[in-house]
Amino acid sequence: MKINDLLEKASTSSFSLWLLNFVLLRNIPFNKPHRLKIKSISKNKVLIHYPYIKNNLNHLKGLHACGLATVSEYSTGLLLLNHLDPDKYRLIMKSLHMEYHYQGKTGATASFELDTDWIKKQVIDPLLSSDAVFVDCEVKVSDDNGNHLSTCSTKWQIKKWDKVKVKI
């Protein structure tokens, strides 16, 4: 089963959402100790939970800044993949900028939204006349009490695979 099919099914089926979380935890080993969990996903929005567990805490017993960056980057990449076929397009993170607003002392949720029109205007149409495009995605992370913990701006480079010069 392709990732896009699983992403699509996860938006309407709790079993498929469980399966997506299961598959991603095992195929992205870096994220496994953090136990990131997709709470919901649709074509336009993703919510990913970052739990308040020992592996995710800093020396002050608050949510670790790097973990907040990870859940933010993960949410943007996942939703972009939900719109773009990974067999046709390559995504590479160019930069990530974090602003921290509040120390997290509970679990947190990253929220990212985009729509099909945005993908068409910012990615698909520009790639008709250019080898690569750069898109900025902004994610807000809030704790379980509704406090705004961080804002992340991730810049992605997106290319069609036939324009990639370095082969895997």
Which residue ranges define each predicted feature?
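HotDog/MaoC-like acyl-thioester-processing domains
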Residues: M1-F15, G104, D115-I168
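Alpha-helical membrane-targeting segments
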Residues: M1-P33, N55
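Hydrophobic core residues within well-ordered beta-strands of beta-rich domains
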Residues: K32, I92, A108, V133-V135, ...
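Short structured motifs
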Residues: K32-K37, K94-E99, Q122-I124
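Catalytic strand-loop segment that frames the active site of acyl-thioester-processing enzymes
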Residues: P33-G62
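Beta-strand secondary-structure signal
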Residues: L47-H49, H97, T109-E113, D136-E138, ...
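Hot-dog-fold acyl-thioester-processing enzymes
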Residues: N55-T76, Y89
